[in-house]
Amino acid sequence: MAQLRRTLPEYTDPITQDYTEHLVYRLSEFSELTDRRLEIALIDNKSVNAFAAPGGIVGINAGLIFHAETEGQLASVLSHELAHLSQRHFARRMQRQKDRSLANSLMILGSIALAGVTSNPNALLVGQQAITQQNLSFSRGDEQEADRIGFKNMVAAGFDPKSTSYMFEKLQSLSRLSGSNELEFLRSHPLTKNRIADAQSRAQGLEGKNYRNSLDYDLVRNRSIVHFSEVPRQAVTVFKKEVEVAKTKKKILDATYGLALAYSKDNKHSDALENMRNALNIDSENLILQIGLLELHIAAENFFEAEALASSLLSTNPNNYPITMLYNKVLMNKGDYELGEKILRELSLIRPKDPEVWYWLAEVQGLDKNVIGLHLSRAEYFFLNGAYETSIKHLRMAMDLTSNNFQLTESILNKIERSHKSIEALKSVS
């Protein structure tokens, strides 16, 4: 994961990260995975791509959320990737290679991810070697097995059986629009007529049920739409039209939320807050909407209102990821660094592998003059991002300040050793 973070731009939206993690974990409960310790990386790229790799790594382009029109369509892709993981297709593919070294494994993983980010086939060149298309693609048998298992698990999790075929149709449409620049997801997951026909056949006879399509997904998808909107005013126009034509409360709420976010991105904070309150009037219990109001208060620099709301939300949703991250912003603005450090330290125990948590913990510790804590948190941040030498530098600076704390010194020495081992592992595959 650290190697991926060194090359991929992360989509650092706590609300989307939190939603996606819950969805992946839910799907994993219905999968054949025996080890469900997963790390989910959201990648800030508009193209459609997702991948799973040994070590429980699940990479998802934010563009997949942008393009998947329903939660079921997103679930169909994620279930497919979890099936690849549970059936060890990536590992088996490596075993079929003559060179089964870690270097080749990292090359293939990096190529899949990097090509999806750049949308450029040349990105498949890693170092001095080109990974062939045969190496990048799953075999036909692997794809069929992942389709079958992924479909079964997706349906068991409560999603519409037609979601897979609908997503295939979406991918076909996007592929036609992309012209010669074939979608990266289709490079590594070739979409054949047989796969489409099989997906349609599996869905037959499984109709007539109220399937999952949560409001939360629609809201999260609108976040991606606004995020990728280069001209906020155009997004405002689009969502205004959606509000006008919406016929149901759910669609009105969904579009109104998107409109509020678009107004905020366009720095129309009064309009943004008005529309977010309108959305909350329809569903006052939805947590994403409540957090959305908090976000907009912060964007509008209404810090008094933001602090009261953040404190209230965190008291009823302790250690909630997006609420904690937003509350810390409010506390940093207020100068209450001690409380900011407290809530982020608690969150770091729950999310020890989240670089964003360590980054902001280091920031607030620095402001609070906690120099040892600052260096330790920065060391963790750099370690998680694969900058091992920089991590060691901060650990040594922390150790210089802890000469009388033998327990902490021992902990720091262990972390330095951890970084040295990671450096040696990289050298062995270079």
List each language-model region with its residue ranges.
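Extracytoplasmic and endomembrane cell-envelope/extracellular-matrix remodeling and assembly machinery
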Residues: E10-T12, T132-S311, T316-N319, I343, ...
